[in-house]
């Protein structure tokens, strides 16, 4: 599959390409494998694998995101989240799950936690906000729905803008060094060097909830 994508990338003009493929084992376990290929390093490829969990109806990523403490955390996408992402980020109804996953893998390279409480988290991305529910039993952050930037309230926008430029910068660096060279970038230390702390982000987004009461 990766070789096929490399051939497609060589024929086209795109900077990178991503495709998502279905895979099922003999015991009927369903997987979705997203393969990312970058023109700048065409001999290498990056992939994420999602396992479908029928009991909870979500796609659990076998790889990890970085939380604010720079430690690995597992996450999953619900079908509802993927539908809302397609509708609100891409303006498309009834997009296939594979196409939505491929777009997320291609366009969202880095995320930043900007709010959390005992039950939920809010993660900022280049496309908008992921609203997550914490599943303590499974140790997974479940992405329940997606909020595009144009839907944000004024206090939410303030929190988002604090990290928007950094997300863009880190997305470019992530694509360059982490996806291709497997070198981890440290967002937390960079934020601290710019005078931005986790408390700043949480307080900014938290104003939205204070004003809502």
Roles of regions detected by a PLM:
Residues 1-213:
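Ribonuclease/tRNase effector modules and their secretory precursors
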